[in-house]
Every structure is written in structure tokens, then in C-alpha cells.
């Protein structure tokens, strides 16, 4: 996609709870001029396209339709939400093999269409499926992006903001690592309007050390809490995807926490996608933003990456996945 292109086209693959919520976010936030939706349940997809189109008189003109894979050929962005949902009691990593098969089938058909844009992956386990999208597509690593820890970081900022009594937009803090159980908070660089978090807390006494531990656990386990109550999470990730989409289509060079390919940014972390901040624009990842981690944080990053690598290596040792790899 050229940064000056006026007509911006998004194809969404997967019209489940996350996908349809994302489509709704694009419509209400006036993002993109064309939205095609692909799903195996074609009648439901046609219904969603019609329903979303009825909101356009309140927003802005947009072409919305039930698409097929041939429509990907001139898209700027393809967003992948298709996959088996996470069930109560199931971790994101439990989903690996069944969603890898779906991912392989979907990515192969998208590439066959002649697609030359950017992949944005949200299906879980997102770090593993972003890696597999890169492998199956043969695309440059900069043009394959995962939603990563974007939602986790938003949850973290919101939880901190609620505890200390400020707007979440004034809290600057990141969750890094796997989007899942091995993620970690980068406490060493968290700040409120430029004031280091620990300095802020020392001056204001809003929360003690155990309170911070409990806050992080609530952030890390938020998805499990929501899944147990309503069966799935979709609104938060949908808005996170819309934010990433806007940054790409508008060539914002925004810094967002995403699944980013690792090639030595952090010692001992290579050949995997994992959550870290990165600059993102019209051509995908411009460059990662390598927050200097303290020793404890680096160890957590390495442990998280090692867990992901073990799963990736096991999966791609199987002929059905290894034979489809192009990278």
C-alpha cells in the first residue's frame, strides 16, 4: 500500500464474535473505504454485511460485502480472526494444532489471490499463528503482524489508571511477551505523564507492592474471567484491531505493542513472533522499539519466547506444516 492511497481496502477473514465486532468498529470509527468479509458461513456473512451497511447513513460511505478469497488480490490489509475459539478452562496454546490447520488453508488461498498487502493476525494463539502466517505466506516479516499484547497493555493501563485515579490515556505501560500465560509487565518503564510509576506511587500511596502483583495477575487472567462469565472475549480485541488498522492505513508511524518478529532484539530471543512495542505504518512494521529491560524482565522475555519456540518447533516438525512453509 502506498502511504498516499485514498481508497483503502480491508478484507476480514473470520466473521465470528471477534471478526464481526471488528467490522462494527471499522464502520463506527470511519476506518477504510471498503470492507470485504470472508467466512465459511456465507449466509451469516451476507447478513452481517447488510446489517453493517445500514449504519452507513450515520457514519461515512463504505463498500461492505460478503467476499471470497479472490477479493484479497488488491486489498491493503487482510485481518485474520478465523479459528476455533478458546473454551472455558482452555489456554490459548491449547488451540495450536487445530488453528494451525485453519491458518494454513486460509493463508494459502489469500496468497494465491495475488495479495501483496499486510497481514494482521488476531486468531489465537496469536504469536504462534503470526509466525505460521509468515511461514506459509513467504511474506517479508515486516508485512506480517500480530495483535500481540495490544489488548493486554490496554488492560494494564486501564487497571493502573483506575487504581491511581487518572485517565488511562495518561498511563504509559506495556505488557510484553506471549499474549497469554507467560506475558509480563514492564514495571521498570511504566510511567504516569512522564513520572515513573514507582515514584508516583511513593508520592501518592495509591497501591502497595502486593497490590501491584494482584493487579498484574488480574490483567494476565482477564480473558479467563471473561470467558467463564460470557463464553468469549471480543469487544476489547476488536477495538485494538481497529486501532492497529488505522495506524497502518493512515501511515501513522504509531508505537503499538504487537507480535513482532524477533531476530536478536533481546538476548536469547530469536526466530519467533512475540509481543513488544513497534512503530507501525503503511508498509507494516517500520522497526521494533526495544525497551531496555532489567534482568528480571529479560529473563521473563526469554522464558516466554522459549515456550513459544518449543510449540513452534514441535508444530513445524510435522510434515503437513513443514511442507507448506515458504520462509
Curated annotation (Swiss-Prot):
Pathway annotation: Fermentation; pyruvate fermentation to lactate; (S)-lactate from pyruvate: step 1/1
E.C. number(s) listed in UniProt: 1.1.1.27
Catalytic activity: (S)-lactate + NAD(+) = pyruvate + NADH + H(+)
Domain of life: Bacteria
Predominant place of localization: cytoplasm
GO cellular component: cytoplasm
One example of a Gene Ontology biological process annotation: lactate metabolic process
Protein location: Cytoplasm
InterPro entries with a match to the protein in the record: L-lactate/malate_DH (IPR001557), L-lactate_DH (IPR011304), L-lactate_DH_AS (IPR018177), Lactate/malate_DH_C (IPR022383), Lactate/malate_DH_N (IPR001236), Lactate_DH/Glyco_Ohase_4_C (IPR015955), NAD(P)-bd_dom_sf (IPR036291)
Annotated substrate binding sites: 86, 92, 124-127, 152-155, 233
Coiled-coil spans in chain: none
Subunit structure: Homotetramer.
NCBIfam families, alphabetized: L-LDH-NAD, PRK00066.1
Family note: Belongs to the LDH/MDH superfamily. LDH family.
Protein name: L-lactate dehydrogenase
Species of provenance: Streptococcus pyogenes serotype M1
Amino acid at each position: 500500500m502506498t502511504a498516499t492511497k485514498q481508497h483503502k481496502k480491508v478484507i476480514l477473514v473470520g466473521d465470528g464474535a471477534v471478526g464481526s465486532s471488528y467490522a462494527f468498529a471499522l464502520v463506527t470509527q470511519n476506518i477504510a473505504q471498503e470492507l470485504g468479509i470472508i467466512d465459511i458461513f456465507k449466509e451469516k456473512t451476507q447478513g452481517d454485511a447488510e446489517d453493517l451497511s445500514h449504519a452507513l447513513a450515520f457514519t461515512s460511505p463504505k463498500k461492505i460485502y460478503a467476499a471470497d478469497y479472490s477479493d484479497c488480490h488488491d486489498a491493503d490489509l487482510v485481518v485474520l480472526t478465523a479459528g476455533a475459539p478458546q473454551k472455558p478452562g482452555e489456554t490459548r496454546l491449547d488451540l495450536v494444532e487445530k488453528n494451525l490447520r485453519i491458518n494454513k488453508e486460509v493463508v494459502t488461498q489469500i496468497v494465491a489471490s495475488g495479495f501483496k498487502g499486510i497481514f494482521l493476525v488476531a486468531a489465537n494463539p496469536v504469536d504462534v499463528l503470526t509466525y505460521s502466517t509468515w511461514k506459509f505466506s513467504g511474506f517479508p516479516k515486516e508485512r506480517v503482524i500480530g495483535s500481540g499484547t495490544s489488548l493486554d497493555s490496554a488492560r494494564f493501563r486501564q487497571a493502573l489508571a483506575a487504581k491511581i485515579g487518572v485517565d488511562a490515556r495518561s498511563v504509559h505501560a506495556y505488557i510484553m511477551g506471549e499474549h497469554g500465560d507467560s506475558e509480563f509487565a514492564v514495571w521498570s518503564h511504566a510511567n504516569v505523564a512522564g513520572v515513573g510509576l514507582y515514584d508516583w506511587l511513593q508520592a501518592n500511596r495509591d497501591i502497595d507492592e502486593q497490590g501491584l502483583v494482584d493487579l498484574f495477575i488480574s490483567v494476565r487472567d482477564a480473558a479467563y474471567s471473561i470467558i467463564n462469565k460470557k463464553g468469549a472475549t471480543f469487544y476489547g480485541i476488536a477495538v485494538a484491531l481497529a486501532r492497529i488498522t488505522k495506524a497502518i492505513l493512515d501511515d501513522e508511524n504509531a508505537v503499538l505493542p504487537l507480535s513482532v518478529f524477533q531476530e536478536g532484539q533481546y538476548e536469547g530471543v530469536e526466530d519467533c513472533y512475540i509481543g513488544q512495542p513497534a512503530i507501525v505504518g503503511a508498509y507494516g512494521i517500520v522497526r521494533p522499539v526495544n525497551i531496555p529491560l532489567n534482568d528480571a524482565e529479560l529473563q521473563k522475555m526469554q522464558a516466554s519466547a522459549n515456550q513459544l519456540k518449543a510449540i513452534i518447533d514441535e508444530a513445524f516438525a510435522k510434515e503437513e506444516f513443514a511442507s507448506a512453509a515458504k520462509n
